[in-house]
From Swiss-Prot:
This is Large ribosomal subunit protein eL18. Component of the large ribosomal subunit. Belongs to the eukaryotic ribosomal protein eL18 family. PANTHER family: 60S RIBOSOMAL PROTEIN L18, LARGE RIBOSOMAL SUBUNIT PROTEIN EL18. InterPro entries: Ribosomal_eL18, Ribosomal_eL18/eL18-A/B/_CS, Ribosomal_uL15/eL18, Ribosomal_uL15/eL18_sf. Component of the large ribosomal subunit. The ribosome is a large ribonucleoprotein complex responsible for the synthesis of proteins in the cell. It is found in: Cytoplasm, Cytosol; Cytoplasm; Rough endoplasmic reticulum. SUPFAM superfamilies: Ribosomal proteins L15p and L18e.
Length: 179
């Protein structure tokens, strides 16, 4: 018998444009040919993150952003988050920060506006095209509850199965495949 060569899995598929229409104008600015925005490596990373789905653009809490911006060498820099910035009620005092994000939650916006200077991505692209004084931040992608379900095979410990009923959950050892 011969070897079957399947070429349908050869090519590496990358998103070339965003699925959402809301981000399309931002992509046009960051792709603008001949401008400083299209050549800077920082902007290429931002452009690639703009294409990503919402699961790959997880929300970042204010507490995590504050913790990341307190690291040495990051004072007086702009925190760039390609995603949503959410509120954290455990934080009472927010230090002075400059933030550029796609979206800031409504409850968070009223609280943050007192302490934080918020820039849109369009303003960030026009203000400093080469991004010398900015830090690109991202939240952990596997922090979602759903990622526990597709971590391991069903018989491995700490796997969270999709349970149809609790009877099946109690009989879990009988339902798994054993050699």
């Amino acid at each position: 018998m011969g070897i079957v060569i399947q070429h349908n899995k050869d090519r590496l598929v990358r998103p070339k444009q965003p699925l959402s229409e809301d981000i399309t104008l931002l992509v046009k600015i960051y792709r603008l040919p001949g401008s400083k925005c299209s050549t800077a490596p920082f902007n290429k990373v931002v452009l690639r993150r703009l294409f990503m789905s919402r699961t790959h653009r997880p929300p970042m809490s204010v507490s995590r952003m504050i913790r990341k911006m307190k690291l040495p060498g990051r004072e007086n820099r702009t925190a760039v988050v390609v995603g949503t910035v959410t509120d954290d009620v455990r934080i009472h005092e927010i230090p002075n920060l400059k933030v550029s994000a796609l979206k800031i939650t409504r409850r968070n916006r009223t609280r943050i506006l007192k302490f934080v200077q918020i820039m849109r991505f369009v303003g960030l692209a026009l203000a400093a095209p080469n991004r010398q004084k900015s830090v690109l931040l991202s939240a952990p992608r596997n922090a979602r509850d759903v990622s526990r379900h597709f971590a391991n095979a069903p018989s491995i410990p700490h796997t969270k199965p999709y349970v149809l009923s609790n009877k099946l959950r109690r009989r879990g050892s009988k339902l798994t495949y054993n050699n």
